[in-house]
Amino acid sequence: WVGGITSLVAALMATQQNDIKKILAYSTLSQLGYMVMAVGLIAPEAGMFHLFTHAWFKALLFLGSGAVIYACHHEQDIWKMGGLLKKMPITAITFLIGTLSLTAVPFTSGFYSKENILIAAKDSPLLYIAVGVAALTTFYMFRLFFIAFLGKARDHGSKVAKEVPVVMWAPLALLTAAAIASPFFSQFFPTNGHVEVHAVPHFGDKLVLMSLGAFATGFVFAFLLYFGKDKEPISIPLFRNKFYLDIIYQRLVTVFQDAVAALVHFFDEFIIGGLLVDGATRSAQGVGNIFRRFAQNGSLSSYAYLMGLGAVLVIYFTVFAK
């Protein structure tokens, strides 16, 4: 449940973000929740398989977003982009393939690895969360693609954007191939008897139909809401502000943290430093001053008395101490 709820909450956050890197970051958090959910469903091999395939297409998407940011003069707001498919066709196509992999379109790596997680969840209520997250993933990724790569350029950066040099798009091409071919390495992921990791689609399976239905639902909603749009048609503050977790952290966690820090500072400053360290020093100095005043007072008789007392103590400890 921890993985499932994490996956759902992060996916909802991603639906209202405008920063291209934040969308992918919350998407990554959501997919990590997917993997943890698989582990909780006693299917760690399915989680590891999704981790393996996810590494390829998410690396493709992050590098693609970096290419877009570079071409748009460091602009990261997707609403200030637009029309990049014509200006950056290689980057746009590779980004689209990465999007298709993430959204589990058949014959891409994400389709096979997500199917294994759905199989693991088929007898659990988490199946509905998994399918819902799949629909949300399709929604926010095609929202990103429709806004940033289609339509018209909305800002100077996207108007002057051009395809990145070969040293930047060549890795995108390699990762695109890996995003498609990586499922065929599933034989290297041993099973434990609960879920069989496979790269062969089961198109007649109900779970596959649910997965395809989730993709279709997310795509249709993204198309209806964002295709050809120049501004945000809906605003959900709860999702846009990330369930106010940052504010909660600042108001509660930070206050508690500051209180504990103040207490520790007081203990260190006044107890350890003031009483123990400085107190011991002042005590030693005080005792030393007392003895100094008594022993070094300039009186010859006092010196003789102390010398005699010292001699008596030496004789006592030498002769009688044993």
Regions found by a protein language model. Name each.
Residues 1-163, 178-184:
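Hydrophobic transmembrane alpha-helices and their helix-loop junctions in integral membrane proteins
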Residues 49-52, 125-130, 205-210, 296-304:
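Membrane-entry segments of alpha-helical transmembrane domains in multi-pass membrane proteins
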Residues 58, 135-143, 214-234:
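Hydrophobic alpha-helical membrane-embedded segments
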Residues 98-102, 171-185, 257-266, 313:
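Hydrophobic alpha-helical membrane-insertion segments
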Residues 102-107, 180-187, 223-224, 314-321:
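Alpha-helical transmembrane segments of multi-pass membrane proteins
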Residues 134-136, 176-180, 211-221, 253, ...:
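Hydrophobic cores of alpha-helical transmembrane segments in multi-pass integral membrane proteins
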Residues 161-219:
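Hard-cation-handling environments
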Residues 192-206, 231-322:
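Aromatic-capped, Gly/Pro-kinked transmembrane alpha-helices
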